[in-house]
């Protein structure tokens, strides 16, 4: 009786082994599960999704398995990829090779569509892709090189060099999607960041770790002002700068790169053989790039800046030009993904995307990131959702005026429209606050008198008003300053003016100590001593 049952399983096992099509049935599945431990982990793949999410923001766990899929649909900058096994997490990077160009092409997962299919945004042109070609899941979000090797180099959104100077010499990589610093890591001390530019330091002082909005149209000196800030911060603090060109014109980006070399902010690798000694890294997502690249290039630049802040303890200056184009690219991506648009056609996630970017720009107990963001205002409407989303995060606004630029006063910062959150006597000091308010008062009185002067002339003003106008005109000219980065155009040495000298100089003008000096002496000088010397020179020439 014992032999019969023993033969029965053996007999049953043979048909199971012979009939290979029957292997997928339930009879074979338990046996595979009992024998092969790794196979047993595959059904548990959904549990690994949270781990993948963590990998997208912090570090890459060794336990994540990269899967492969195939391309099933291409719609412009959006592609659908079908996976047979584990689906990649949202924000994971997918890689393939563009058959037409032979170049590596990176996608970012944006949606799970069901039926083992994900929808992803391309970071480069999709011309040349074919259905059915293999796509690999990297198991984490887009990684870019960071560290000193990026200084003086130009890279694109996925960290590839585009300056034709060979590979970027860095073995340190970071993902572009990361968590903002925790509350314990952040510092809440309001410290003034001295830029060496008189009008900014006096009227709208910047904060270390703050966000500054630079409002300006074309041709008012926005690029030169940004360059001077990069130069001054790097010299004064030994810090580094990162420029993220979001929707930049290719010509402007090329000009800026060469201007930085000419102004000694960066080192020319063609002359020196390397970029060692450079102080600025450049990341460009140009105007002709797909919306995915333009929507992520700001995060690439921010990741480089975060490394210098967290690992090297530097005070970093981050420029984003233009925040409006960052928002615009997000709206394009949102439309491609089929999301219902919000107000004025913008993406419904506008506030979230802006918050994710801005919250990472902050001071920690290791270093700081100070961000200067150029912001375009559509149709001069400040209530437009795009600039309105930025306003909630800004600590200071620097407004460049075309009227002031027309008077050849550079930087063309409007001292009456520019504001700062730290314009408080408890933070900047009572003397600084009083001098700044006195300057604003004189300029405001002059502004209100301009109509009377235009109609009736200066002769109809009272003696007190005439004195106010004279001092206001001297203040307006003294707010100008020669820039280091413009030396090659003006043949005038640049001036870095300390905050102490700035306050002392303007206090003297407001108090009437320099009423005897001519207006021309105050134009394009550094501290007040240079104005006095210029007045003596003008008197000697006369």
From Swiss-Prot:
Record EC number: 7.1.2.2
Membrane topology of the entry: Peripheral membrane protein
SS bond partners: none
InterPro entries named in the record: AAA+_ATPase (IPR003593), ATP-synt_VA_C (IPR055190), ATP_synth_F1_bsu (IPR005722), ATPase_a/bsu_AS (IPR020003), ATPase_alpha/beta_chains (IPR050053), ATPase_F1/V1/A1_a/bsu_N (IPR004100), ATPase_F1/V1/A1_a/bsu_N_sf (IPR036121), ATPase_F1/V1/A1_a/bsu_nucl-bd (IPR000194)
Gene3D superfamilies associated with the record: 2.40.10.170, Bovine Mitochondrial F1-atpase, Atp Synthase Beta Chain, Chain D, domain 3, P-loop containing nucleotide triphosphate hydrolases
Cell cycle among keywords: no
Reaction equations catalysed: ATP + H2O + 4 H(+)(in) = ADP + phosphate + 5 H(+)(out)
Domain of life: Bacteria
Binding site for ATP: 216-223
Gene Ontology CC entries for this record: plasma membrane; proton-transporting ATP synthase complex
Pfam families (UniProt xref): ATP-synt_ab (PF00006), ATP-synt_ab_N (PF02874), ATP-synt_VA_C (PF22919)
Main location, first listed in the record: membrane
Bias (Low complexity): 1-50
Keywords: ATP synthesis, ATP-binding, Cell inner membrane, Cell membrane, CF(1), Hydrogen ion transport, Ion transport, Membrane, Nucleotide-binding, Translocase, Transport
GO molecular function, one term: ATP hydrolysis activity
PROSITE patterns the UniProt entry points to: ATPASE_ALPHA_BETA
Cellular compartments annotated: Cell inner membrane
UniProt-annotated stretches for the region Disordered: 1-61
Described purpose of this protein according to its UniProt entry: Produces ATP from ADP in the presence of a proton gradient across the membrane. The catalytic sites are hosted primarily by the beta subunits.
Protein family according to the UniProt entry: Belongs to the ATPase alpha/beta chains family.
Classification via PANTHER family: ATP SYNTHASE, ATP SYNTHASE SUBUNIT BETA, MITOCHONDRIAL
Subunit structure: F-type ATPases have 2 components, CF(1) - the catalytic core - and CF(0) - the membrane proton channel. CF(1) has five subunits: alpha(3), beta(3), gamma(1), delta(1), epsilon(1). CF(0) has three main subunits: a(1), b(2) and c(9-12). The alpha and beta chains form an alternating ring which encloses part of the gamma chain. CF(1) is attached to CF(0) by a central stalk formed by the gamma and epsilon chains, while a peripheral stalk is formed by the delta and b chains.
Identification of the protein by name: ATP synthase subunit beta
Organism of derivation: Caulobacter sp. (strain K31)
Taxonomy of the source species: Bacteria, Pseudomonadati, Pseudomonadota, Alphaproteobacteria, Caulobacterales
